[in-house]
Amino acid sequence: MRAHGWIGLGIVVAAEALLLAREPIVAGWFTPIVWTGYVLFMDGLAARLTGRSYLTTDRVEGVLVALASIGCWWLFELYNAPRFWRGGEAVAGLWWRYHNIEPNLFVRRVGYDWAFATIFPGLFLTATVLRATVFARARVTPWRPSPRALQLAVVVGAVSVAVPVLFVSAWLVPLVWIGWALLLEPLNYRRGRPSWLADLTGGDASRLLALLAGGAVCGVLWEFWNYWAATRWTYSVPYLGSVKIFEMPVLGYLGFPPFTLECYSMYHWLRGWLDADSGLRPPLL
């Protein structure tokens, strides 16, 4: 494994040790620190297994993935606190809330963006490693969605992403985690962009299963590491909200796999707007 992979693993171990020792700076910044270590570790594994990674061969792609991660997660923050501009109690999140956050607004924003920048890279690198190992030979019967099914998915997706903004309700959180995938994946498929739908037409399920499993892995790690951090988030949902594993209500874990499909679709829809002659290599995943 490349040196930066071992450095990343060292960061994860050191961050956990310092957290247990109640070191205040690490405790307050634990999420971005530990996830930076995880991304470095998985990037090193990806380079070892596939010969490619964001920090070795695909650096421009890595920057694009991180920027898309920041922007898309701020979109989800808007869903979570749709009335934030009113101030006061209106800024409280519908589904998750942050605690013990940095009082300085500039430093807080740095912390937010740093943490948000690790989301897509963490998901995609985990999926890359799983695709190269566990799901390398995953095959299914070839399946091609009909034009009508694609159109229906786009319509349902458009409604799903619009309704939680127009009608603010804590009950609508599932729409946020599936709507963008339903809206954008058919568009990526029809325009020839990287797409797990396109893979299925050839019977290749490796990317789809790797993304789903990668979401589950990262979801458990998010909640496990968040539970012990000083600066952390908690959830408020109207269904089985008191039945939890760490801070996440048990039903919430079902959202991580489709969330990963959504992140993948969002990223490749955004990436698809770049000029074909931009010189970018084919994407890592």
Identify the function of each model-found stretch.
Residues 1-285:
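Aromatic-rich, lipid-facing transmembrane alpha helices and their immediate juxtamembrane interface loops
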